[in-house]
Amino acid sequence: MTTITLPPPNARYQFSILPEIFKQGLPDTDADTFDYAKENFGLIPRAYPSDGTMEDVESKTPWQRFEHYVKTLNGNAEEGTEYKVLYLGRHGQGYHNVAESRYGTKLWDDYWARQEGDEHAHWADAHLTEIGEQQARDVNTFWRTALADAKVPAPETYYTSPFYRCLQTASLSFSSLDLPADRPFVPVVKELLRETNGVHTCDRRGASSIIRKDFPMYVLEKGLPETDVSWTPDRRETPVEHILREHVLLEQVFAEDEHEFISFTAHSGTIAAVLGAVGHRRFALPTGGVIPIVVKGEKLIR
């Protein structure tokens, strides 16, 4: 069990989850069997305090009423308080996931994760398998229906981990969608969204020049070095360190991004750390899984 006191002493923000919005946040929802695509993304059917201020509310979908609620919360929020909806997506199956299943987690952690690959595949900065590509296309299919029918708000900003499997997943998930003109798919590559750092070669970033070459429409955040200077072969980031790293990421997003609906394409460990940073219950995602959350950010006075 990871024990951590949040916010950390040097924090600029305190984060919390807006409860009773999504089924994934309820204690009796089983992450192993829950299918977000069959459950309206997990949105709990309910009335909102803002329903009375919405024109033609009876004709609106639950997601349209929820979107109005979020905008109302932000419109009435005290100075320094803001609400953001985060769509947290895990990459599709990568070659490293297949290798861990082949060898078992203990042998993977003890030996194979430190190697570049085996006779079956190369997994340093792992790419998606064919199954992983299809999982990402399944996310695209979900979004296509969700946008058109349920009226789920499209992300206004897209952030992705710099690892190749996430760059692929983001592209396959979003690039072919009929998105609103003011919400184009122009993802920003953020280093802080990387997987738990160190030791595992699958979690060592490839060259930034490869990202520019293979994903020319992606925007690399300022200062991303050509090579992965933070990865080390002999020390793995701890769960507490990872939660603190994602707390910094959230501080950046809340301080610098004015948008309310934001997509993160990342990793199992990273999403777990984001959930930990905002006080959400543990909710493990399968490869290709997505979970929405509403985060309340309160700026701290130091």
Q: How would you name each of these model-derived features?
A:
Residues 2-185, 189, 212, 239-246:
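Active-site-proximal alpha-helix that buttresses catalytic centers in soluble enzyme cores
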Residues 188-198, 204-235:
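Histidine/lysine/aspartate-rich catalytic loop segments that bind and position anionic ligands
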Residues 232-240, 271:
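Regulatory modules of eukaryotic transcription factors, especially in plants
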Residues 242-258:
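A short, acidic, amphipathic alpha-helical segment used as a generic capping/interface helix at domain edges
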Residues 92-95, 163-166, 193-195, 229, ...:
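Short, solvent-exposed loop/turn segments at secondary-structure junctions
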Residues 97-102, 199-203, 277:
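Short aromatic-enriched loop/helix-cap "lid" or pocket-rim segments at secondary-structure transitions
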Residues 253, 257-267, 273-275, 281:
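C-terminal transmembrane module of eukaryotic multi-pass membrane proteins
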Residues 279-302:
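Domain-level recognition of soluble alpha/beta enzyme cores
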